[in-house]
Amino acid sequence: MMQAWTPEGMAFLQDAMACCGYYPALARRIAPYLPKQAHVCDAGCGLGGLSVALLPYCRHVTAVDRAAAPLENLRQRAGHDPRLTVRQGDIRCLPPETPYDAMVFCLFGGVEEALTVARQQCRGTVLLIRRDYAYHRFSTGRVPVGFTAADSEDTLRHLGLSYRMERFSLEFGQPLRSLEDARRFFRLYDRSGGADPPLHRLTAGPGPEFPYYLPNRKELCLLAVEIPAMEEA
């Protein structure tokens, strides 16, 4: 299901991106798996935080997403960096002129869908970044999340594919300007329909602009699959 990119949601995410250093830290985890001088596709890039963070580690990044709003936001933030190409549309219908050296699917799409696209568009490494937890973090109830690490491993084993795997955790909490902002945030992201926002989860924020903070330590799993090995399977 395509994410609904509202101005309010994008504003919250930009605040988190600016304060947490999540995407630069994630890019450092991904970098050792990239071929030298790689052309990398960030599939389902959203606001492009990871796309921009990957630029120091490769020759070029192509950021692809279906939604227009986050891509326009990315273009405004990134300017005219010649190392970055932004493309709007269905990744399945946007093959590159020359196959990518690596493709990153970060919390986006199922394994079989990602591998189908990668077989057609990539000649090197497919990197799947998956949640390593079962329930949605910003909901008051227990709401399952999709595309988990366990599900992805099961699929790769079923397909008979070899892969490299790395588990780690990164902080990606939400800085908040006021308690009213916190209430708005929970109304936007609480998928359990809880009536009362769990304000007790807030801690002191990083500074005067953001006096409140909602911690969120994300357990993640990186799964790396090589296209040549897929062709032999």
What is each model feature region?
Residues 1-34:
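Conserved class I S-adenosyl-L-methionine
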Residues 47-57:
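Conserved SAM-binding loop of SAM-dependent methyltransferases across substrates and taxa
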Residues 67-69:
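Conserved SAM/SAH-binding beta-strand->alpha-helix loop
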Residues 74-75:
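Conserved SAM-binding loop
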Residues 80-91:
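Conserved SAM-binding strand-loop segment of SAM-dependent methyltransferases
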Residues 109-121:
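A short, conserved alpha-helix within the catalytic core of class I
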